């Protein structure tokens, strides 16, 4: 597989493909429901914020999603889900989508991005534990909650809130 991926913003015809990709990548429905809930919530969903890495046929094989969240009253971005089809995992497709998403976040002049994810994966993109920035989540302040400062703006400190919250049953 290639180490050089084409990336782009999702297009309307990608939506069902990305739902299927999510189910295949995570092996369950919860993350698909999470994705659908974000699409349905205008306080979370940012048009043009789903970045895909594509295969040779321009079909998405991985993606990274940016949505709106807040630290206190300050809007920042949340990264996730990030997913790749099993056949494309560990081949750089997901990382390419993450890099495209973070580049777009910098262009938007956002102050920061948070992610709840693998603490051995996201530091390669510059993420550090969110508590180092004074960002706290009411239910979780562990090593998997990370933040990335974008640009020169101060990273807001305070309580992290999301407009969409789903709990696993």
PLM region spans:
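Short amphipathic alpha-helix that is part of the acyltransferase structural core
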Residues: 1-37, 44-61, 152-169
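Short hydrophobic/aromatic beta-strand or adjacent loop that forms the aromatic wall/cage
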Residues: 48, 141-145
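Conserved beta-strand in the GNAT
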Residues: 50-52, 59-69, 75-83
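Conserved acetyl-CoA pyrophosphate-binding loop and the N-cap/start of the following alpha-helix
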Residues: 88, 92-100, 110
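Short alpha-helical functional segments enriched in proximate histidine and acidic residues
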Residues: 104
């Amino acid at each position: 597989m290639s180490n050089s991926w084409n990336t782009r913003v999702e297009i309307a015809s990608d939506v069902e493909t990305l739902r299927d990709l999510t189910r295949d990548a995570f092996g369950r429905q919860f993350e698909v429901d999470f994705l659908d809930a974000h699409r349905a919530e205008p306080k979370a969903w940012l048009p043009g914020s789903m970045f895909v890495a594509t295969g040779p046929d321009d079909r998405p094989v991985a993606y990274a999603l940016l949505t709106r969240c807040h630290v206190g009253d300050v809007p920042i971005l949340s990264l996730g889900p990030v997913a790749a089809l099993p056949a494309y995992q560990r081949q750089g497709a997901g990382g390419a989508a993450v890099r495209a998403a973070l580049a777009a976040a910098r262009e938007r002049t956002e102050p920061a991005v948070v992610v709840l994810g693998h603490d051995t994966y996201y530091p390669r993109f510059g993420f550090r534990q969110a508590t180092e920035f004074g960002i706290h989540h009411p239910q979780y302040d562990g090593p998997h909650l990370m933040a990335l400062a974008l640009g020169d703006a101060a990273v807001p400190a305070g309580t992290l809130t999301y407009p969409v919250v789903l709990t696993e049953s």
